[in-house]
Amino acid sequence: MREVELIIIGGGPAGITAATEAARIGASVALIDENENLGGKVFGPTGNAIKGSVSDKIEKDIRSQLLKDFNRVRDKISVFLNTAVWDIVDQRIVSLYPTDGSDKQINRIKGAKLIISIGAFEKAIPFPGWTLPGVFSVGGLNTLVKKKILPGERFLLAGAGPLQLVLANHLINAGANLSAIVNAASLRDITASAFPLFASIDSLKLRSGFDYLRNIKRHNIPIYRSHIISKVYGTREVEKAEIVKIDRSWNPIRGTEKEISVDSVAYGFGLIPCTELTRLSGCKHIYDESRGYWRVELNERRETSVPGIFAAGDGLTIKGYSAAIAEGRVAALEACAQLDRVQRSEADRLLQPALRKLKRFNRFGQIMDAISRPRPGIFNILTDDTVVCRCEEVTMQDVISAVADGAADVNDIKRRTRLGMGHCQGRFCGQVINELMWRLTGVREQREVFTPRTPVKPVPFGCLAGE
């Protein structure tokens, strides 16, 4: 079993920055990422093959500089690509498996310190028809469009959050027919957030936001505010979508339904942190009502409740790549100070600029999360036959029956229905099961989360045998 001073899980902006900083200081580092290239979702090698905004161009420049700095010290870093982490033992030993089918010899790595920077995934709310071919997540469709792949002819965007604007502009610039943008946030919500948003955002993001809106207006794309997608129709694939106006609590208003002929729908409600590894490691988590998701508790130096385990990037809270870069630097400097690789006074001095930036980034993230956080009324669009857990094909009726039979909590629902036992390990259905149970029981109890289990992701039996 190989041993290093610092293990970094996740090779996005936070992980790359942390590895670069720690290696520059002189610590022995292992950097692990599931993908064949470093960079994560934003700075990955897919790039952007279409004409973009000023923001897209700046992202390319930042990515280039990030990788240039990393490559200067890469020979000092043990890099494991196409490698996933499926277990963390004794809070220091990381179990690995190859995602590319290769026969890699290293199954475990032990580290004195651990930085978890595995990013985030999209928040999805089920609706009738969401399993039809032609329904995409906002991020999933954006990845295709950036590669100049248009999987349809008439597109509709639905949900809430800033990713909508980004995808809308990529679709427009790729020459797609964007039929409409359906945004759950009301004009009142957006107006109320305007001043604090402007105060917390840098000029580049502000300029890009206005550029996006101008581009949408210039192409006469209709925007339906205070609306959600309520249903998708189709025999074998998406043929049309139904949208409906909502009130302040996102309850659908009957009689306001409108059908739009489309063959592709992208929707989502922002991002939520990936917490499976921090939960598996025993780190304390809290549910942040203002943000609408579980997050790991940590101190200013990004150390969790488990000494020696740090977290950075969107795996903490959603703030974007600039914040992820700053957090990777903070976590690495603190870890290296604890390893006696850098004097405490020097680490404290180097930390300050990043910590000051993070205060502003955090305010920006809080505002974006508040705008995109789903309100309770949206769950009224679910019908009995709506699929809640896609992996195990568990429907709303299955959940209703389990609660009627006495299911007491989310883990009881999981045992009775297999909800959350599929390939994604409850990453999507786990987002909504609390709300569904509360609606069925009429009792809003303490929010719960699925008990973390190993392996956190499906692994081959051969890998387990190798352990």
Segments (PLM) and residue ranges:
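Residues forming the flavin
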Residues: 1-467
